[in-house]
């Protein structure tokens, strides 16, 4: 059986990257929440 996680840097960035988060209102909310929490890394 093949593994379900087949990593791809491009897909990772496109789905979870900073620019993708900034492109939607809810994504910006996610970043704001992570800043408020004091996360060192905001996005993938």
UniProtKB/Swiss-Prot annotation:
Disordered: region residues: 1-44
GO molecular function: structural constituent of ribosome
Family: Belongs to the bacterial ribosomal protein bL34 family.
Gene that this sequence comes from: rpmH
One BP annotation, GO: translation
InterPro entries listed in its UniProt record: Ribosomal_bL34, Ribosomal_bL34_CS
One cellular-component annotation, GO: ribosome
Keywords of this entry: Ribonucleoprotein, Ribosomal protein
Designated name of the protein: Large ribosomal subunit protein bL34
Matches recorded under PROSITE patterns: RIBOSOMAL_L34
Presence of the UniProt keyword Ribonucleoprotein in the record: yes
Pfam family, one: Ribosomal_L34
């Amino acid at each position: 059986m093949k593994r379900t996680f087949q990593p791809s840097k491009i897909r990772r960035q496109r789905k979870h990257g900073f620019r993708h988060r900034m492109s939607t209102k809810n994504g910006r909310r996610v970043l704001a929440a992570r800043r408020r929490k004091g996360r060192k890394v905001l996005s993938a």
